[in-house]
């Protein structure tokens, strides 16, 4: 009965708007970003709702990142690996190359922050099908999203 209104049937979309009102279509964007840096990026969560520019929380490809800095011991903590100049520079260069082809505000990546902790299935950051749950990641890591939009030196500024 249409008079009863609308019934929600399905999950809430991951898409959002930037502060400019421009829609960001997260699914395709995530795929494109990961593909552009697959050697060192396992997955990303796209942030930027109500912000001027997009940022990403980067879940690193640990093997690829370790390969970039072979001078670091194999048992060194991930935090040490992702803080290395080689990993930070490689990610910056790959994202800058991505931005050459994706320069609109809804696809251009302006900031990146590498994650030490992988997505947590117990915190619903991974779906039953093995995909990253964008909303859960951003909600659980709200402090890191805030850091992503700060002047913290760990944040990579991408041109």
Protein language model annotation of sequence segments:
Residues 1-107, 121:
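AMP-binding/adenylate-forming catalytic core of the ANL superfamily
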Residues 16, 42-47, 92, 96-159:
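Conserved C-terminal "lid"/linker of ANL adenylate-forming enzymes
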